[in-house]
């Protein structure tokens, strides 16, 4: 939505949200709807410190032959071995102890929140603010997930939003399901990804000591938190077999977290409906949201990347929003940005798929 259509309702309490509400009534009437005027319209974005996650429709791929794919054989081999180990882990499920299942569930949710509430909604999009204890928790959880450090993940994700479905999009879904799911990690980046990624403003990430600390010590952190700890805890504390601890609690769990995240890039860009903006590829996909703890409302998210819920409906199939709201209730999260129902409905009427329009 253009910046001049945004309105900010400012609250002095850190436990409330900053609401992006309705555009001017004349705009709504042009779109077929009517809403009352609101008292204040801002000329700037709801997040004046952030611009580079807003879709740029003016960017077009360069004409000419596409560069030849360069395979990264190290990644191909490691991903292959990981998924073979995960498949073997499936066969061990009947022999695992109940405490191991609970441990895997705990580690899955921690890893998922490190991606969704952490690197995605906090650091990539700055949709809310977090106090130091919460940021430390999320940086640890993000390291447990092992999906690149916060700096690199955020850079790629901002490029994905700004140059979506072009060669400058790191996991461009127009290159097919496999490429957008995992293939983009198995080949060298397209030159356009490097070129346009270098133009993004990442000063907020560079200025955050915690983010740069993680980046500096990422390899030993991942070795400890993604592989050693989840293997040793069940083996040492409740006598799980080392085989089950390694292949089920570690490799299978890690592979499932990876694929749940990847489905947001692949399935949620191809399968589902587009109630908010039919001109973009991202879709609403409930199944993806189940696995990715709330990240499947993707048409909404690409339309309103500044909404901390990444969804119109807050807690509906969205554990991440529930978690952030709990953190706000105890004072660890604040300044949550939320698009109002009026603004979402206005956008739906203007650009949504006809079958999704209502009211």
Curated annotation (Swiss-Prot):
Binding locations of Fe cation 2: 160, 269, 298, 302
Segments on the Cytoplasmic face: 1-72, 119-217, 264-359
Cystine pairs: none
Cofactor: Fe(2+)
Sites where the protein binds substrate: 75, 148, 155-156, 188-189, 262
Ranges annotated as spanning the membrane: 73-93, 98-118, 218-237, 242-263
Binding site for Fe cation 1: 120, 125, 157, 161, 301
Record topological domains on the Lumenal side: 94-97, 238-241
Localization annotation: Endoplasmic reticulum membrane
Keywords: Endoplasmic reticulum, Fatty acid biosynthesis, Fatty acid metabolism, Iron, Lipid biosynthesis, Lipid metabolism, Membrane, Metal-binding, Oxidoreductase, Phosphoprotein, Transmembrane, Transmembrane helix
Cofactor note: Expected to bind 2 Fe(2+) ions per subunit.
Motif interval(s): Histidine box-2: 157-161
Main location class: endoplasmic reticulum
Catalytic activity as recorded in UniProt: octadecanoyl-CoA + 2 Fe(II)-[cytochrome b5] + O2 + 2 H(+) = (9Z)-octadecenoyl-CoA + 2 Fe(III)-[cytochrome b5] + 2 H2O; hexadecanoyl-CoA + 2 Fe(II)-[cytochrome b5] + O2 + 2 H(+) = (9Z)-hexadecenoyl-CoA + 2 Fe(III)-[cytochrome b5] + 2 H2O
PROSITE patterns found in the cross-reference section: FATTY_ACID_DESATUR_1
Gene Ontology cellular component terms for the protein in this record: endoplasmic reticulum membrane; membrane
Example GO BP: monounsaturated fatty acid biosynthetic process
GO MF: iron ion binding; oxidoreductase activity; palmitoyl-CoA 9-desaturase activity; stearoyl-CoA 9-desaturase activity
Task of the protein: Stearoyl-CoA desaturase that utilizes O(2) and electrons from reduced cytochrome b5 to introduce the first double bond into saturated fatty acyl-CoA substrates. Catalyzes the insertion of a cis double bond at the delta-9 position into fatty acyl-CoA substrates including palmitoyl-CoA and stearoyl-CoA. Gives rise to a mixture of 16:1 and 18:1 unsaturated fatty acids. Plays an important role in lipid biosynthesis. Plays an important role in regulating the expression of genes that are involved in lipogenesis and in regulating mitochondrial fatty acid oxidation.
Written domain comment of the UniProt record: The histidine box domains are involved in binding the catalytic metal ions.
Identification of the protein by name: Stearoyl-CoA desaturase
UniProt source species: Capra hircus (Goat)
């Amino acid at each position: 939505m253009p910046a001049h259509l945004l309105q900010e309702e400012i609250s002095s309490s850190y436990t409330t949200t900053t609401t992006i509400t309705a555009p001017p009534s004349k705009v709504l009437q042009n779109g077929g709807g009517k809403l009352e005027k609101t008292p204040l319209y801002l000329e700037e974005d709801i997040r004046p410190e952030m611009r580079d996650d807003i879709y740029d429709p003016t960017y077009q791929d360069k004409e000419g032959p596409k560069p030849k794919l360069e395979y990264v054989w190290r990644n191909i081999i490691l991903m292959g071995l990981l998924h073979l180990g995960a498949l073997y882990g499936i066969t061990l499920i009947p022999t695992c102890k109940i405490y191991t299942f609970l441990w895997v569930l705990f580690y899955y949710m921690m890893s998922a929140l490190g991606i969704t509430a952490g690197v995605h909604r906090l650091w990539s999009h700055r949709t809310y603010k977090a106090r130091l204890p919460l940021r430390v928790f999320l940086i640890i959880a993000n390291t447990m997930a092992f999906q690149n450090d916060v700096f690199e993940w955020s850079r790629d994700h901002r490029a994905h939003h700004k140059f979506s479905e072009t060669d400058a999009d790191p996991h461009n879904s127009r290159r097919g399901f496999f490429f957008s799911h995992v293939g983009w990690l198995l080949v060298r980046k397209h030159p356009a990804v490097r070129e346009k990624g270098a133009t993004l403003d990442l000063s907020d990430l560079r200025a955050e000591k915690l983010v740069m600390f993680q980046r500096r010590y990422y390899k030993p952190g991942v070795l400890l938190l993604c592989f050693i700890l989840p293997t040793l805890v069940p083996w040492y504390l409740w006598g799980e077999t080392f085989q089950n601890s390694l292949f089920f609690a570690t490799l299978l769990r890690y592979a499932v977290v990876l694929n749940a995240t990847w489905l947001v890039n692949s399935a949620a860009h191809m399968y589902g409906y587009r109630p908010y903006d039919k001109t973009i590829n991202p879709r609403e996909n409930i199944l993806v949201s189940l696995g990715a703890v709330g990240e499947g409302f993707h048409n909404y998210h690409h339309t309103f990347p500044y909404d901390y819920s990444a969804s119109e409906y807050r807690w509906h199939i969205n554990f991440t929003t529930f978690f952030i709201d709990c953190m706000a209730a105890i004072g660890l999260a604040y300044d949550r940005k939320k698009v109002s129902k009026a603004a979402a409905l206005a956008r739906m009427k203007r650009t949504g798929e006809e079958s999704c329009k209502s009211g």
